């Protein structure tokens, strides 16, 4: 997590147009950048509902900015933005506070479990701190493509991060999933090593 105050100060001083993606913000208890809209009008905040609510098939999200900025963006929006299903889903998801609390607790438990599995694997050199529902991992003695191939028979997918800035082919991103998915990964790593 970056120091948002520090970044915003720098960006505002340079009069940058700022787009902040808060799609993973629900996984942690960090503040939104929305408060900066009161004093800075070149800010856009994007939020996808598919991340926290595990609804990849439903393309629902929001963009928050000043009234003027939203009016400018409206000329580019599609005629049919949301289906009735999407709209109902969005409303139900936002109203369900219990889901949010339970999901956070389950994600934390499963992430700790996943971290412990990875720490005990000789394939892993380093695990980086994450507030989201995935872990960035540096592999010890194989590259991302080799790791993907070794995990394929177990139907486990990891994200090759070699095309991310400052990362090479030894970095993968592993999603935090269920406890049973963690057990499958643990078994796979034990058999691969």
Task: Give the role of each language-model region.
Residues 153-154, 165-193:
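PLP-dependent enzyme catalytic core of the Aspartate aminotransferase-like
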Residues 37, 118-119, 151, 189:
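Hydrophobic C-terminal alpha-helix "anchor/cap" residues
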Residues 1-18, 22-52:
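Active-site pre-lysine segment of PLP-dependent enzymes
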Residues 57, 131-133, 166-168:
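Short acidic/glycine-enriched loop/turn segments that link adjacent beta-strands
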Residues 108, 121-154, 176:
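Conserved PLP-binding catalytic core of the aspartate aminotransferase-like
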Residues 3-7, 33, 114, 147, ...:
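A general structural detector for well-ordered alpha-helical segments in enzyme core domains, enriched
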Residues 42-120, 125-127:
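PLP-dependent aminotransferase class I/II
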């Amino acid at each position: 997590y970056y120091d948002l105050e520090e970044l915003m100060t720098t960006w505002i001083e340079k009069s940058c147009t700022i787009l902040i993606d808060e799609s993973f913000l629900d996984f942690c208890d960090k503040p939104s950048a929305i408060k900066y809209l009161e004093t800075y009008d070149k800010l856009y905040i994007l939020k996808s509902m598919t991340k926290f609510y595990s609804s990849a098939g439903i393309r629902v999200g929001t963009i928050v900015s000043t009234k003027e900025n939203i009016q400018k963006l409206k000329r580019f929006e599609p005629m049919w933005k949301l289906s009735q299903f999407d709209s109902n889903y969005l409303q139900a998801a936002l109203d369900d506070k219990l889901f949010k609390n339970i999901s956070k607790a389950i994600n934390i438990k499963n992430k700790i479990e996943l971290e412990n599995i990875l720490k005990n694997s000789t394939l892993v050199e380093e695990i980086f701190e994450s507030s989201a529902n995935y872990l960035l991992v540096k592999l010890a003695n194989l590259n991302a493509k080799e790791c993907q191939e070794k995990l394929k028979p177990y139907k486990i997918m990891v994200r090759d991060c070699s095309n991310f800035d400052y990362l090479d082919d030894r970095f993968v991103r592993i999603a935090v999933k269920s406890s049973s998915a963690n057990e499958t990964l643990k078994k796979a790593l034990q058999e691969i090593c």
